[in-house]
Swiss-Prot record:
The record marks S363 as: Required for activity. F-type ATPases have 2 components, CF(1) - the catalytic core - and CF(0) - the membrane proton channel. CF(1) has five subunits: alpha(3), beta(3), gamma(1), delta(1), epsilon(1). CF(0) has four main subunits: a, b, b' and c. GO terms for molecular function: ADP binding; ATP binding; proton-transporting ATP synthase activity, rotational mechanism. NCBIfam families: atpA, PRK13343.1. It comes from Zygnema circumcarinatum (Green alga). Belongs to the ATPase alpha/beta chains family. Keywords: ATP synthesis, ATP-binding, CF(1), Chloroplast, Hydrogen ion transport, Ion transport, Membrane, Nucleotide-binding, Plastid, Thylakoid, Translocase, Transport. This is ATP synthase subunit alpha, chloroplastic. ATP binds at G170, D171, R172, Q173, T174, G175, K176, T177. Its main location: plastid. Produces ATP from ADP in the presence of a proton gradient across the membrane. The alpha chain is a regulatory subunit. It comes from the Eukaryota. It catalyses: ATP + H2O + 4 H(+)(in) = ADP + phosphate + 5 H(+)(out). Pfam families: ATP-synt_ab, ATP-synt_ab_C, ATP-synt_ab_N.
């Protein structure tokens, strides 16, 4: 029989009493008054912060947006079907944040940065707030490095720089997503991290984009953030900020990033739905009063950082859909005023076979030639002027029956330049190929080629230069200048190829 020693027992009890610490955990708790349509009204939660995450009994997460005198209006990040009136809600004390790491490259995630591609969890090293303040004036420097899209019409006439925000705007089915995805494909080997944010799109469309990226090897440097049309409005509203937070992680490490928001019209509609259900007063087109701030605080996060912050950059390509070409609607005018230029895609051009359907006349880049290499500046200056004169002449020539020879020549040149701007989807061109193509057009070397033959002639010319005159590309890549030597090589290549091409016909 074991002897019980009272002194041992008392010493154990004494030690435990000494180790006892009084712990009081303060939890901010409320009660659900009403729930439905992705919105919950909660009584209590006196100390809750605006934008704080809330946790419901069933594990659903919400965000406190309306702090009223007698209740709190919260939006739910799920369907909330199991939340009942009278169930308790706990304030978490956290503002919405996401994990970030290099492991996100090549993955498809949702607005909470959780993987949805079935490839397992993503290891993360740190967290970033979904809503971070934009870099200040002192932290930035002016945009000066080109962000090549691989599309001649843009790189020559509406150049985009690293750290710029360029709006892509047009009706549905005019190729807006194609311009953005081609730009991402063209960043291969350029050491640029790309983030593609799909907001309220069909799941099939997102799958198609991801497949294109995978086939072309673009997923190695791309993150896709997707919230499809069946996702709760809250998540569609958050998705662009998640994309920006992921890009910021790389930007502050001194890397160059490109973010595509496809598209912000759907985000504004999701925000309008949330605001109206929260009973916030509606404004123009029933959007809430702060819809401008919704987009400005997102797009201001795109920047070219100064040397003290590592020279990183975030370039934003927001996409906005117009109805019947109406650029003066509320959301289009808002985003046009926030961005540094817009690329306008026209349904008429698209239907007449001009693709990409970029309306060069009303598209602008407010950064301009600062975002071009010298070689491109040297050849592209003439292109925009010639196309503008051609558009004007074409309008007049519809009424005139007999045109003089000079006018006929200018119209013929313009038709060939328009052909020169046409490109197949997912076939971006390198800078040296673009320089060669533009030089051929603006200097009249295409005038002897039939209009219908221009595209095949240029495709073959680019292949001919790569195989027979590789030194041309080397000069442009190394010096970034269209030197006399490069010009001589190019003229020789054009002459040789033209002779061979005309003999084939």
């Amino acid at each position: 029989m074991v002897n019980i020693r009272p002194d041992e027992i008392s010493s154990i009890i004494r030690k435990q009493i000494e180790q006892y610490t009084q712990e009081v955990k303060v939890v901010n708790i409320g009660t659900v008054l009403q729930v439905g349509d992705g919105i919950a009204r909660i009584y209590g939660l006196d100390k809750v912060m605006a934008g704080e995450l809330l946790e419901f009994e069933d594990g659903t997460i919400g965000i406190a947006l309306n702090l009223e005198s007698d209740n709190v209006g919260a939006v739910l990040m799920g369907d909330g079907l199991t939340i009942q009136e009278g169930s308790s809600v706990k304030a978490t004390g956290k503002i919405a944040q996401i994990p970030v790491s290099d492991g996100y490259l090549g993955r498809v995630v949702n607005a909470l940065a959780r993987p949805i591609d079935g490839k397992g969890d993503i290891a993360s090293s740190e967290f970033r707030l979904i809503e971070s303040p934009a870099p200040g004036i002192i932290s930035r420097r002016s945009v000066y490095e080109p962000m090549q899209t691989g599309l001649i019409a843009i790189d020559a006439m509406i150049p985009i720089g690293r750290g710029q925000r360029e709006l892509i705007i047009g009706d549905r089915q005019t190729g807006k997503t194609a311009v953005a995805t081609d730009t991402i494909l063209n960043q291969k080997g350029q050491n640029v991290i790309c983030v593609y944010v799909a907001i309220g799109q069909k799941a099939s469309s997102v799958a198609q984009v991801v497949n294109t990226f995978e086939e072309r090897g673009a997923m190695d440097y791309t993150i896709v953030v997707a919230e499809t049309a069946n996702a709760p409005a809250t998540l569609q509203y958050l998705a662009p900020y998640t994309g920006a937070a992921l890009a910021e992680y790389f930007m502050y490490k001194g890397q160059h990033t490109l973010v595509v928001y496809d598209d912000l019209s759907k985000q504004a509609q999701a925000y309008r739905q949330m605001s109206l259900l929260l009973r916030r007063p509606p404004g123009r087109e029933a959007y809430p009063g702060d819809v401008f701030y919704l987009h400005s605080r997102l797009l201001e996060r795109a920047a070219k950082l100064g040397s003290q912050l590592g020279e990183g950059s975030m370039t934003a390509l927001p996409i906005v859909e117009t109805q019947a070409g109406d650029v003066s609607a509320y959301i289009p005018t808002n985003v046009i005023s926030i961005t540094d230029g817009q690329i306008f895609l026209s349904a008429d051009l698209f239907n007449s076979g001009i693709r990409p359907a970029i309306n060069v006349g009303i598209s602008v880049s407010r950064v301009g030639s600062a975002a071009q290499i010298k070689a491109m500046k040297q050849v592209a200056g003439k292109l925009k002027l010639e196309l503008a004169q051609f558009a004007e002449l074409e309008a007049f020539s519809q009424f005139a029956s007999d045109l003089d020879k000079a006018t006929q020549n200018q119209l013929a040149r313009g038709q060939r330049l328009r052909e020169l701007l046409k490109q197949a989807q997912s076939a971006p061109l390198s800078v040296e190929q673009q320089v060669a193509t533009i030089f051929t057009g603006v200097n009249g070397y295409l005038d002897v080629i039939e209009v219908s033959q221009v595209r095949s002639f240029l495709t073959q010319l680019r292949e001919y230069i790569i195989t027979n005159k590789p030194q041309f590309g080397e000069i442009i890549r190394s010096t970034k200048t269209f030197t006399d030597e490069a010009q001589t090589i190019l003229k020789q290549a054009i002459q040789e190829h033209t002779e061979a091409f005309l003999l084939q016909q």
